[in-house]
UniProtKB/Swiss-Prot annotation:
Keyword annotations of the record: Coiled coil
A biological process term (GO) from this entry: mRNA 3'-end processing
Cystine connections: none
Domain named CID: residues: 1-135
Domain of life: Eukaryota
Classification via InterPro entries: CID_dom, ENTH_VHS, RPRD1A/B_C
Keyword hit for Coiled coil: yes
UniProt name for this protein: CID domain-containing protein 1
Originating organism: Caenorhabditis elegans
Coiled-coil annotated residue ranges, if any: 227-273
Length: 315
């Protein structure tokens, strides 16, 4: 396979076709170079967002799907880090017109990921919510398209701005919920540590020699079980919350990066217009200075009277 460079990566993603061999070959190459996954994900997302053809976007989504499924064994973090970009690409589909092909592909992928447990239920739920927005988007023109139709510079869609605000709010809420997580609760761990090891280690049950010991152990087990199940449940919720926080942070970083790119572009455009205005002003000043001084050439010439002007007009 070809050596990894950013140029090679862009070329492979651009030349991607809907043939299964093209998808699989590209996916295998990306997995082989998983050490560059941060760059791969960033370039992949930019390629998706530059595309306006539904078929091209579908091909890119299928590559992401193949990478995510095959990365579970070779590089699980590749799949986890890919999710925010996949969600962002789904949101990009909302801005497309006549994106039935993309909408169908998104629905199909979500079902596959849910059935095969590629992504967590909460992640699949978020993708499903975006999918519903894609379904509804066909009836409403986007602000960016409307601006292009009127010959104006396209502004970033309001949806992206609202998405960034929502990401920030979600991050703050997650951080607030994780201020006192179950994993830091000393009391419950101290309480559980009071029980003998026999109730959590089956091998040590062999040391039980009498029915009285077995009965005592059973009572302790029944007493500890509800407490342990409740604690494990809260720990699981904490883990899910941390996964959600990680996804929201990655999405927030991507939105901030997009915002920076937009404002840098805006600054360059303002600077270009400022330079043009200064050049025009300088040209006007030069033209003004080159005009003859009528007062100096005819200092004593009287101005014509109003009657003389009317008489001249009648003639």
């Amino acid at each position: 396979m070809a050596d990894f460079t950013e140029q090679t990566l862009r070329q492979k993603l651009t030349n991607l076709s809907n043939h299964p061999s093209s998808i699989q070959t590209t996916s295998a190459w990306l997995l082989q170079n998983h050490s560059n996954r941060e760059l791969i994900i960033r370039v992949w997302l930019k390629t998706v967002k530059k595309e306006t053809h539904g078929s091209k976007i579908v091909n890119l989504l299928y590559v992401a799907n193949d990478v995510s499924q095959n990365a579970r064994k070779t590089c699980p973090q590749f799949k986890d880090e890919f999710f925010p970009a996949i969600e962002s690409s789904f949101r990009h589909a909302i801005e497309l017109k006549n994106a039935k092909e993309v909408e169908h592909a998104i629905g199909k992928l979500i079902n596959v990921w849910k059935d095969r447990q590629i992504f967590t239920p909460s992640q699949c739920k978020r993708l499903h919510e975006v999918h519903q927005q894609v379904k509804l988007s066909g009836s409403f023109p986007t602000p960016a398209v409307a601006n292009k139709e009127h010959g104006k510079v396209a502004q970033p869609s309001q949806f992206v701005v609202e998405e960034a605000k929502k990401n920030a709010q979600d991050v703050l809420l997650s951080l607030k919920r994780l201020q006192n997580p179950p994993s830091t609760e000393r009391e419950i761990r101290t309480e559980l540590s009071k029980y003998p090891d026999n109730i959590s280690c089956p091998e040590k049950l062999q040391s039980v020699r009498s029915s009285q010991e077995a009965q005592s152990l059973l009572v302790q087990n029944e007493e500890a079980l509800p407490m342990l199940e409740e604690y494990v449940k809260r720990l699981k919720n904490e883990t899910n919350e941390r996964e959600t926080l990680e996804s929201n942070l990655n999405m927030l970083i991507e939105n901030v990066r997009m915002s920076i790119e937009h404002h840098e572009k805006l600054c360059r455009e303002v600077k270009r217009r400022e330079d043009r205005i200064k050049a025009d002003l300088l040209e006007v000043e030069k033209t003004f200075e080159s005009l003859p001084d009528l007062a100096a050439e005819m200092p004593n010439a009287p101005l014509p009277t109003l009657e003389a002007l009317f008489e001249k007009r009648k003639k």
